[in-house]
Amino acid sequence: VETLLLQRLTGLLGMGKKAGDIVLGFDQVRDALQKKRPGLLLEAADGAEDGRSKVYFLAKALYSNVKMAGALSSEELGVAFGRERVIHGLVRKGPIAKATELAYQRLAGFRARPELDWFPDQDR
């Protein structure tokens, strides 16, 4: 079941990237945050704490109730986007973000959610 949920989530992420609704990379995510509220922040579970904190706290400074998905590894995120690894991503607010968040919540029922330990103020 977990594998199917992961495939569903990575499929949505790939579709979102093709539609132009997803931004990848630290600098691009930082720039996108300064322009518009994100639908969902993507952070690799095995990414460095420093970069993850910078992205999260910038988002929190600009917007309230920022949502983050952190249960996927950099390799799993990379598979979704046709890359070797992805550490930082942002799903722009809209239908893809809502569908991605729902798919992530379903997957999170089978996996640990490390973002809850990274940032205690994250929605549970």
Question: Model regions: which residues?
Answer:
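Short, solvent-exposed amphipathic alpha-helical segments in soluble enzyme
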Residues: P38, Y56-A61, Q105-R106
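Solvent-exposed alpha-helical segments within well-ordered globular domains of core cellular machineries
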Residues: G11, D31, S53-F57, V79, ...
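Catalytic cores of RNA-modifying enzymes
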Residues: V1-K17, Q105-A108
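Short beta->alpha linker loops
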Residues: D27-Q28, G47, L72, P95
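Short active-site oxyanion
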Residues: A19-G20, P38-L40, Y63-K67, V86-I87
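Helix-rich interaction surfaces within compact, conserved domain-sized segments
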Residues: L72-D123
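Feature captures the catalytic cores and cofactor-binding loops of soluble hydro-lyases/lyases
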Residues: G47-G82
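N-terminal first-folded block
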Residues: R8-E43
